């Protein structure tokens, strides 16, 4: 039977869903800014070679998140325009609710959600699974690149060299 989740319960069961995933884990959320605990759990699942799909809907993926995601070989990231859904699903269960995968939301917002277990809520779980599959299909897979960050770093280093040179050379 479905279980109602408040903010802390949603966070707790999201962590449990990630920990208990054995085959696949799909995380669908417009916003991505993972807290350290979720990162640690996803890194562990990556080491276990679990198929992880992350779908996000806001294009402003922060460089720190992009850099971190790039290190995970078994995580596929996709962008879905107009995404507002928040659904976290594994082979054993599903959470549907208001919680974004955004560190701020998990700490500061009042959230609600529903936990569905595949064994207890088979029909509803299958409907949610099918919709999550559809969202993944219509999403564009994103290959995370560090090009922009590297260009910014080079420009920044060039500026630092100019400043150092300016301060080291005697004035004319």
What are these regions (language model features)?
Residues 1-10:
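Glycine-rich phosphate-binding "P-loop"
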Residues 58-59, 81-84, 100-102, 119-120:
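Short, acidic/turn-prone active-site loops that include or flank metal/cofactor-
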Residues 66-86:
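Structural recognition of alpha->loop->beta junctions
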Residues 10-72, 172:
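Primarily the HKD phosphodiesterase
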Residues 62-65, 86-87, 105-107:
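Short, charged, surface-exposed secondary-structure boundary motifs
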Residues 86-89, 114:
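Short beta-strand scaffold segments in enzyme catalytic cores
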Residues 96, 101-172:
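Signature of lipid phosphatidyltransferase scaffolds
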């Amino acid at each position: 039977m479905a279980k109602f989740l408040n903010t802390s319960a949603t966070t707790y069961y999201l962590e449990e869903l990630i920990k208990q995933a054995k085959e696949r884990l799909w995380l669908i959320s417009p916003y991505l800014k993972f807290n350290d605990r979720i990162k640690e759990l996803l890194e562990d699942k990556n080491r276990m070679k679990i198929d992880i799909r992350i779908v996000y809907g806001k294009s402003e993926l922060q460089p720190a998140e992009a850099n971190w995601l790039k290190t995970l070989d078994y995580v596929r990231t996709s962008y879905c325009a107009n995404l507002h859904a928040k659904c976290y699903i594994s082979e054993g269960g599903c959470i549907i609710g208001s919680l974004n995968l955004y560190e701020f939301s998990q700490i500061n917002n009042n959230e609600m959600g529903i936990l569905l277990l595949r064994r207890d809520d088979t029909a509803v779980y299958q409907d949610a699974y099918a919709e999550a599959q559809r969202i993944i299909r219509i999403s564009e897979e994103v290959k995370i690149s560090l090009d922009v960050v590297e260009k910014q770093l080079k420009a920044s280093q060039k500026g630092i060299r100019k400043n150092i040179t300016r301060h080291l050379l005697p004035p004319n």
